[in-house]
Regions:
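Membrane-active amphipathic alpha-helices enriched in small hydrophobic residues
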Residues: 1-7
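Catalytic toxin/effector domains delivered as secreted proteins or via bacterial secretion systems
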Residues: 9-20, 26-169
C-alpha cells in the first residue's frame, strides 16, 4: 500500500510539473536519457562527475548553467561519499552551488522556514562530505537574487562556503 501511495504521489507530481513547466520536464527527461558524462578532465582527485539531480524551472536550469559553465545534467560528487552530496559544478578550483531565480520568494516568507532549514542542512552536508573525503576545496554559493543571498547570510554559514550575488544573464 505504501509503494502504491508513493507511485500515485510521483504521478501527481509529474502531472503538476508537466502542466506548469512542460519545457523543464522535457529537458530533464532528455538529459536523463542522454547522460554519458561530459568527458571533463579538470576535476581533482577525490571528485567525480555524475548525473545531475536538479532540473528545476527553465530559468533555474539556465542560471545553473551560467554559474557552472556545464549543462545541468552534470553534477559533481565526492568519491566514496555514500550520502551522495551533490554540487552543481566545479570551476577554477572551486565547487559551485547555484540558487536560481525565485529562491527569494521561497525563503523570505514565514512558510519558508523549512526551505531555510534545508539550505542550512545542505551547507553542512557539503562541508561534511569534503571533510570525510579529506578534501580542502572552497565552495561558492551563487544567488540569482541579492535578497536571497542576504537571507542565507544570516544562517550559520560554514567558513568553507562563500556566498555571492551573481545576477542572471
Amino acid at each position: 500500500a505504501a509503494s502504491l501511495k508513493g507511485a500515485v504521489h510521483s504521478l501527481r507530481s509529474a502531472a503538476h510539473n508537466l502542466r506548469h513547466d512542460p519545457q523543464g520536464v522535457l529537458a530533464s527527461a532528455v538529459a536523463a536519457l542522454k547522460f554519458k558524462g561530459s568527458g571533463r578532465t579538470d576535476l581533482p582527485k577525490g571528485l567525480y562527475e555524475g548525473r545531475g539531480k536538479n532540473h528545476g524551472s527553465a530559468a533555474a536550469r539556465a542560471y545553473e548553467e551560467q554559474i557552472t559553465g556545464y549543462p545541468v545534467e552534470y553534477s559533481i560528487y565526492v568519491e566514496g561519499d555514500l550520502a551522495k552530496v551533490e554540487f552543481d559544478g566545479f570551476r577554477d578550483g572551486v565547487l559551485l552551488d547555484a540558487k536560481g531565480p525565485r529562491t527569494y520568494v521561497i525563503i523570505s516568507h514565514d512558510w519558508g522556514t523549512k526551505a531555510l532549514e534545508k539550505m542550512q542542512t545542505q551547507m553542512d552536508r557539503q562541508v561534511d562530505a569534503l571533510a570525510r573525503g579529506g578534501l580542502d576545496i572552497p565552495i561558492h554559493w551563487h544567488f540569482a537574487e541579492k535578497g536571497a543571498m542576504e537571507i542565507a547570510a544570516k544562517l550559520n554559514v560554514p567558513p568553507a562556503i562563500t556566498l555571492f550575488y551573481t545576477s542572471p544573464k
